[in-house]
Amino acid sequence: MIQLRNLMLQYGERFILRDATASIGNKDRIGLVGSNGAGKTTLLKILADQEEPDSGFVDKANYVTIGYLPQDGIIAAGKSLYQEAESAFENTLTLTSKIDEASTLLHSLNTDSKNYYEILELIGTWERELENHDVEKLPYRIESVLHGLGFEQSDMKKQTSEFSGGWQMRIAIAKLLLASPSLLLLDEPTNHLDIISQHWLENYLKRYEGAVLVVSHDRAFLDELCKQTFEITQGNLNVYQGGYSCFEKQSKIRKDHLIRSFKSQQKEIERTEKFIDRFRYKASKASQVQSRIKALDKIERIEIETEENSIAFSFPPAPRSGQTIIELENLCKSYGDLKVIENATIRIERGDRLAMVGANGAGKSTLAKVVA
């Protein structure tokens, strides 16, 4: 479907992409990984035609459509939530409008009119095209996707300008999913999702008809979704089979092999340089010295990938507490008529490790503040 061929991109002295070559198939599920600043977003922008490489090519089949979700910065305004989501089907809705207008015109013409059969044929063409879009199911699809991403039925008529930045990104995700491009480019799509919406998105993308290329720091999400992993490191694009866990294992094997090859090459270079230095001025060895110099110049030197800097820290030990740290019994909390917490009972003991989950607005932060 899409071929990346020898992509090169350089910012100043730094290579972002160096001879990057890969392919993306019709149904591929690919995780794009690499350290911050490695070039992941840049590669997505190149695929979305928002940035040009210095050289190389992105070959796409004629039928390919691409949808790109940036990390942030998308603001929708001027429509209700439902209308904004519906705009993903703009071409389909335009066809419906054209058919209605043409049908009205057709009724005003005589059957012997010169334009009658031309318009009739055009309506037939448009109707056949609409059949592929299953227009009757559009309202169901729109509401299904919006509900999956955490919107309530009461949100449908709200103006998009009423939603915060995180919910704006959910609207953008919904529109992309509804538009159903051949390739989805998703840059950190789970950043603004609660765990329930994240699981819904994960399952939706598994069933998605097209290909998906996703950037995420959520290893479990990548493992669950992806069957292939692209890694960008020091400008190189490495391709691995499997999700993130498989990538980690294969990457370690590749790097260990690279280090061994590097050490072996360095020893050979050192031996050659010693020979050259030792016999450089000896006439009987002149031809051998020149031969070694040429061989040294032709060596394609192996480069070792530098390890990412990591930060190590630890919390100072807390004063020893009693066995029961916190105990809540029949705790209630309301904001006006809205009951956020009702009859919550919980005991937290020394050494417990707890996760608090729930939909956005369910009351997680409120409970944490009450406990604090």
Where does each model-flagged region fall?
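Intracellular alpha-helical coupling/juxtamembrane segments of multi-pass membrane proteins
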Residues: Q250-T306
